[in-house]
Amino acid sequence: MTAIAPVITIDGPSGAGKGTLCKAMAEALQWHLLDSGAIYRVLALAALHHHVGLASEDALVPLASHLDVRFVSTDGNLEVILEGEDVSGEIRTQEVANAASQVAAFPRVREALLRRQRAFREAPGLIADGRDMGTVVFPDAPVKIFLDASSEERANRRMLQLQEKGFSVNFERLLAEIKERDDRDRNRAVAPLVPAADALVLDSTRLSIEQVIEKALQYARQKLALA
């Protein structure tokens, strides 16, 4: 009987550093990587492209069911491919981020994408980045981490990222958007943003990314007894 590939789930709010942590862990362990948030962003982008209403669950479900998405790691960067097109940059806009949070609130949309996410579980293992990886998608994962940070710190990180790309941003507006999104994600009826009961809660507010990676890898290796 073939053993089920192990999964390390990394959940947490937007801007906590999940993406950077997951890439580092996947590289260190040489495991596969799933950015579940990207799947919802790809669906949101497809909906925007095809003029499908973000408030119409009936219209979104068939779009989600036939969504052709895959991840390709190239030179340490994760490329998100939608129907053969690299949409890695396009899905990272604030418009798409807000739209993704909206479509993720629908139960049948989540069900349509659930099987696709679980299909990423292959040997030697999977690093799963998301908001409900440890509570819904991979509840049997042997290692679960909930990465958090204050809303102010996350808004500041996002502002710096946007400024580096040449965008002019207002901190207070960005903070308000993050708080609104947090409230929506944490209070939705289906798969709210909460740590799994058996997850390690790691607050990155006052930690460098190197410290976060070190703590997460140490915890994962202890749980998995990896050398």
From Swiss-Prot:
InterPro entries: Cytidylate_kin, Cytidylate_kinase_dom, P-loop_NTPase. It is found in: Cytoplasm. It catalyses: CMP + ATP = CDP + ADP; dCMP + ATP = dCDP + ADP. ATP binds at G12, P13, S14, G15, A16, G17, K18, G19, T20. Its EC number is 2.7.4.25. Keywords: ATP-binding, Cytoplasm, Kinase, Nucleotide-binding, Transferase. Its main location: cytoplasm. One of its GO terms (cellular component) is cytosol. It holds the Pfam family Cytidylate_kin. Signal peptide: none annotated. GO terms for biological process: nucleobase-containing small molecule interconversion; pyrimidine nucleotide metabolic process. Gene3D superfamilies: P-loop containing nucleotide triphosphate hydrolases. GO terms for molecular function: ATP binding; CMP kinase activity; dCMP kinase activity. Belongs to the cytidylate kinase family. Type 1 subfamily. This is Cytidylate kinase. The gene is cmk.
